[in-house]
Swiss-Prot record:
<feature type="domain" description="SERTA">
    <location>
        <begin position="101"/>
        <end position="147"/>
    </location>
</feature>
<dbReference type="GO" id="GO:0005634">
    <property type="term" value="C:nucleus"/>
</dbReference>
<feature type="compositionally biased region" description="Basic and acidic residues">
    <location>
        <begin position="306"/>
        <end position="317"/>
    </location>
</feature>
<dbReference type="InterPro" id="IPR009263">
    <property type="entry name" value="SERTA_dom"/>
</dbReference>
<feature type="region of interest" description="Disordered">
    <location>
        <begin position="36"/>
        <end position="66"/>
    </location>
</feature>
<dbReference type="Pfam" id="PF06031">
    <property type="entry name" value="SERTA"/>
</dbReference>
<feature type="region of interest" description="Disordered">
    <location>
        <begin position="306"/>
        <end position="325"/>
    </location>
</feature>
<dbReference type="InterPro" id="IPR029708">
    <property type="entry name" value="SERTAD4"/>
</dbReference>
<protein>
    <recommendedName>
        <fullName>SERTA domain-containing protein 4</fullName>
    </recommendedName>
</protein>
<feature type="compositionally biased region" description="Low complexity">
    <location>
        <begin position="221"/>
        <end position="257"/>
    </location>
</feature>
<feature type="region of interest" description="Disordered">
    <location>
        <begin position="221"/>
        <end position="259"/>
    </location>
</feature>
Length: 377
């Protein structure tokens, strides 16, 4: 006796397990059992879910999964679920075991401490490192100071050298450094006067080569100019002036090695001669004779008793009294006076108040100058 069991339970789709997958497996099993022949009855039309499942199964063997037709159902389900688990690994496997930054720094410090323990004398090592650090700081500071000290192009034509160096701000240098070529570009003589504290730039230097000849010419000119002044002067104080004036001029010219301007004689100027600096002559011997016009010259003479006598002469009288060889001297004197009166090359303009103060200082009898000593009494 045999027991026949119905197969309806296996063929009916179960909704809880997924009807699409079971229907797909049933069609594949039926096709395999019939050996490629068409199954009896009308072929069921696969739904949209069946198409997706069949396409998924058809392309599964390209990923290393064997064809599900030749494999049992249990093996296929196991591999399918195992493949899904491989695609999503656990998060615990993603975190690598690495040392944190703080632990790494602590390890480095510990190793450096172990190295320091093997040094013979730690104090010597520390002292050496401090010295090296200080030396590097000094070298860096020296480089910064050298870069900050920039000497511009030497254009000292308008300003004197002393004022130019005082105007420069050099906090890193005790002494300013100037190249030799820049010192050679300075051609003007700077003289600081006591009157007003102004700086006078002389474009023409004093001739030192012909000191003896110019002194003799000055003495002769002074003697010739003093002889007619006695007859023309009306005041009694000027009648006693001709006798001591040649002696005072000769003594002053003989005492000073250079023909410098003083109360009773003039100066010869030459362009190609050597300059005279402040240390060679006293500042009180250089004075400016202000001229109200180019044709009139004023000469101030001082007697032994301290009285002042003024003499005024025209250009014709001066040229007639002086020798013929002193024409260049007179032209140079005119350039000298014109330089102080109008300014050389329109750069050094003197204010009118300073001119008036100079005139008052020269004409007032209170400021007495000594020709022999070259100073104020």
């Amino acid at each position: 006796m045999t027991l026949v069991l119905s197969m309806n339970r296996f063929c009916e789709p179960i909704v809880s397990e997924g009807a699409a997958e079971i229907a797909g497996y049933q069609t594949l099993w039926e096709a395999d059992s019939y050996g490629g022949a068409s199954p009896p009855g009308p072929a069921p039309v696969p739904s949209q879910g069946d198409r997706g499942a069949s396409s998924h199964l058809a392309g599964s063997h390209y990923r290393g999964i064997p064809n599900p037709i030749s494999t049992p159902k249990v093996t296929y389900f196991k591999r399918k679920y195992a493949e899904d688990e491989d695609l999503h690994p656990p998060l615990s496997s993603c975190s690598h075991k690495t040392i944190s930054i703080f632990e790494e720094r602590a390890h480095i410090l510990y190793m450096s401490l172990e190295k320091l323990r093997f040094i013979d004398d730690p104090e010597v090592y520390l002292r050496r490192s401090v010295l090296i650090n200080n030396l590097m700081k000094r070298i860096h500071g020296e480089i910064v100071m050298q870069n900050s000290w920039c000497l511009p192009a030497c254009s000292l034509g308008g300003t004197p050298a002393q004022e130019w160096f005082l105007a420069q701000d050099c906090p890193y240098r005790k002494r300013p450094r100037v190249a030799k070529e820049e010192w050679e570009k300075i051609h003007t003589c700077c003289f600081y006067q006591e009157c007003g504290g102004h700086c006078l730039n002389l474009p023409l230097s004093v001739n030192t080569s012909v000191g003896s000849t110019s002194a003799a010419a000055v003495a002769s000119a002074a003697s010739s100019s003093s002889s007619p002044s006695t007859s023309s002067s009306s005041s009694p104080s000027s009648s006693s002036s001709p006798s001591p004036s040649p002696s005072s001029s000769s003594s002053s010219s003989s005492s000073s090695p250079l023909p410098l301007p003083s109360c009773s004689h003039h100066v010869d100027f030459d362009i190609g001669s050597a300059p005279i600096y402040k240390s060679q002559i006293p500042a009180s011997e250089i004075f400016v004779t202000n001229i109200r016009s180019l044709g009139v010259q004023e000469k101030v003479k001082f007697n032994n008793d301290g009285k002042v006598s003024h003499e005024t002469s025209r250009d014709g009288d001066a040229l007639g009294q002086e020798p013929v060889g002193n024409d260049l001297d007179f032209e140079c004197k005119g350039q000298f006076y014109d330089y102080f009166e109008t300014g050389y090359n329109e750069r050094n303009r003197v204010s009118e108040s300073w001119k008036k103060s100079l005139r008052k200082k020269e004409l007032s009898p209170s400021s007495k100058l000594c020709c022999n000593r070259g100073g104020k009494m």
